[in-house]
């Protein structure tokens, strides 16, 4: 088995590389290219196995959803005096916002572990530059 880090030939039974001691059986993340919001509900182990590009796209989706939940929550909280909003609606809006905040923090934590920082803004320009680097 050839080490994907240093290129050293190892026996097929080896767990780690004899030269650099990198794990040989660990698969590198592959670019998925199709991400949707519901993937953020998957467990940490699944999210950590995603490609960095896919995580950035997913983080962008989660941040957008979190923003819309925040605006909904604020609209419900600041309802005019004549409008009575049931408490369960308020609680639902707040819980949705907290839920997407927690999911956002999980993805940001994985990105910090990989990149050393979390991007403040994930726009098309950032994703295009990263995609170009991946393809070359």
Located regions from the model:
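Catalytic-site/binding-pocket detector for metal-dependent nucleotidyl cyclases
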Residues: 9
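Short Cys/His-rich micro-motifs in 6-15 aa windows
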Residues: 21-31
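Long amphipathic alpha-helical coiled-coil segments
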Residues: 111-133
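Charged, solvent-exposed faces of alpha-helical coiled-coils
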Residues: 58-61, 65-68, 72, 88-92, ...
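Long, charge-rich boundary regions
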Residues: 29-89
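Short cysteine-rich clusters marking metal-coordination/redox-active sites
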Residues: 3-6, 17-20
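Flanking scaffold residues of small Cys/His-coordinated metal-binding clusters
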Residues: 12
């Amino acid at each position: 088995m050839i080490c994907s880090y240093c290129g050293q030939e190892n026996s097929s039974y080896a767990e780690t590389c004899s030269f650099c001691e990198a794990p040989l059986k660990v698969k590198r993340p592959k670019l998925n290219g199709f991400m949707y919001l519901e993937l953020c509900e998957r467990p940490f182990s699944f999210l950590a196995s995603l490609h960095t590009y896919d995580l950035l796209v997913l983080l962008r989706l989660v941040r957008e959803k979190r923003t819309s939940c925040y605006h909904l929550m604020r609209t419900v909280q600041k309802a005019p005096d004549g409008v009575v909003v049931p408490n369960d609606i308020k609680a639902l809006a707040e819980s949705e916002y907290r839920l997407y905040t927690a999911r956002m923090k999980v993805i940001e934590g994985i990105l910090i572990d990989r990149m050393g920082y979390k991007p403040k803004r994930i726009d098309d320009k950032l994703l295009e530059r990263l995609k170009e680097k991946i393809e070359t």
